[in-house]
């Protein structure tokens, strides 16, 4: 590759969760070279694919994406340099993958993430030309993810994350404040904090900082309009921490993403989450401090040993709690996890039936909740122009997280992505709202 190229054309693909997106953005910024991002691989100098392998479907998506990319460039006279990184490489190993997919030029294990940039520059035979190598934000000016730690201290019996990502590694306050300032200086309005367990941040640092210490540094930053916390492990939401969040007020938004995984204590014990086996208490604590709280959770249906009685228990729990947002996943046995070899595995048809029943319950909850906003005036962050109707925009109220929740479809004059606007809610649908904005 030409080491004197003024700008390299990069086609970047980030699979999986927002944490992967942050890794991709940090990596591309850390290369310290001028990059032009293009939508298709055909004209790229290099392609970077950051993979996921958390569950079987993520593994399959990673494999399909790599093979499709290889097929897309196969007939080109000048093929792009293909780089594949991330959890998929860490889980299956470069040696095996290199043999199975020889068309990939460079494999990068997620355990070597600190040296990804050096390995890429060496492989491309180029040198950094920038003194400042800040993260490249790819989500526009409305929001950005802030990954505050990697790895996990928990031992959930169904999860591959500790074996792939390792134990907890918190990023320092200085690193995160610097990165946040860089993000906000670009006009971004909302920071969304993510990790395998956001509440665990700082436990591995020398001074055993708690999350409150980090938030004290972030909430005062100029330009921050919203701060959202995702991936909150139930036991990390102590009454003391909730009272702290109440005291700080805006720009923190009382949106709580608390993955409970199940409601029945027997199943939670089998999941290796015995300390989280009273989700009702956690939710009651949240609502006692924040009556206006919006709750998101995720549950796994069809876990080994889940009986019809356990399923009914979970169904009634969801009906009673009325989570505003709910992710429902059918259990998948992941090789190497304790749950994969547990007795009483649930059949696929039963899993899918139970999932469908839970989704029907949640649909009714969501429809009823969203009807309450019709006729009200809300503050919205505008995310994007609608891909099919250029006079329509998509955005979010404070109670909607990017990419995982529903959205607000906005029409009106002089609207721009990245703006905070006031709009009247005109309609509600199953998971989305429709709004009309004022003239600006």
UniProtKB/Swiss-Prot annotation:
Family under the similarity heading: Belongs to the methylthiotransferase family. RimO subfamily.
Domain MTTase N-terminal positions: 8-125
Positions contributing to [4Fe-4S] cluster 1 binding: 17, 52, 87
Organism: Lawsonia intracellularis (strain PHE/MN1-00)
Pfam families named among the record's database cross-references: Radical_SAM (PF04055), TRAM_2 (PF18693), UPF0004 (PF00919)
Cofactor section: [4Fe-4S] cluster
Record-given protein name: Ribosomal protein uS12 methylthiotransferase RimO
Role according to the record: Catalyzes the methylthiolation of an aspartic acid residue of ribosomal protein uS12.
One biological process term in Gene Ontology: tRNA modification
């Amino acid at each position: 590759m030409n080491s004197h190229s003024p700008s390299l054309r990069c086609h970047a693909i980030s699979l999986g969760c927002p944490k992967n997106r942050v890794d991709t953005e940090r990596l591309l910024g850390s290369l310290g070279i001028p990059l032009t991002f293009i939508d298709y691989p055909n004209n790229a100098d290099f392609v970077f694919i950051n993979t996921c392998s958390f569950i079987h479907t993520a593994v399959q998506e990673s494999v399909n994406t790599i093979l499709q990319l290889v097929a897309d460039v196969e007939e080109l006279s000048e093929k792009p340099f293909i780089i594949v990184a991330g959890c998929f490489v860490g889980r299956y190993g470069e040696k095996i993958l290199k043999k199975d997919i020889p068309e990939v030029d460079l494999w990068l294990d997620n355990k070597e993430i600190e040296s990804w940039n050096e390995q890429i520059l060496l492989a491309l035979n180029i040198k950094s030309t920038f003194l400042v190598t800040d993260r490249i934000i790819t989500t526009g000016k409305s929001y950005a993810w802030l990954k505050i730690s990697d790895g996990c201290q928990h031992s959930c019996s169904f999860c591959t994350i500790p074996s792939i990502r390792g134990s907890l590694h918190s990023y320092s306050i200085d690193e995160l404040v610097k990165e946040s300032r860089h993000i906000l200086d670009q006009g971004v309005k909302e920071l969304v904090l993510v990790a395998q367990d956001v509440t665990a941040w700082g436990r591995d640092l020398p001074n055993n900082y708690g999350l409150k210490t980090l938030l004290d540094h972030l909430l005062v930053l100029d330009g921050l309009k919203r701060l959202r916390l995702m991936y909150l492990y139930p036991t990390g939401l102590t009454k003391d921490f909730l009272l702290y969040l109440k005291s700080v007020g805006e720009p923190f938004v009382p949106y709580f993403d608390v993955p409970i995984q199940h409601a029945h204590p027997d199943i939670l014990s089998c999941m290796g989450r015995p300390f989280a086996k009273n989700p009702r208490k956690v939710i009651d604590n949240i609502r006692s401090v924040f009556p206006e709280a919006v709750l998101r959770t995720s549950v796994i249906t069809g876990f080994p040993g889940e009986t019809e009685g356990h399923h009914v228990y979970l169904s009634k729990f969801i009906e009673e709690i009325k989570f505003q947002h709910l992710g429902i996943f059918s259990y998948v046995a992941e090789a190497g996890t304790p749950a994969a070899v547990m007795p009483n595995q649930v059949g696929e048809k039963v899993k899918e039936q139970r999932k469908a029943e839970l989704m029907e319950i949640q649909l009714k909850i969501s429809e009823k909740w969203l009807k309450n906003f019709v006729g009200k005036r809300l503050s919205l962050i505008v995310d994007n122009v609608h891909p099919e109707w250029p006079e329509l925009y998509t955005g979010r109220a404070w109670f909607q997280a990017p990419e995982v929740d529903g959205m607000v479809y906005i029409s009106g004059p002089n609207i721009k992505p990245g703006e905070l606007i006031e709009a009247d809610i005109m309609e509600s649908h199953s998971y989305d709202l429709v709004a009309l904005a004022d003239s600006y």
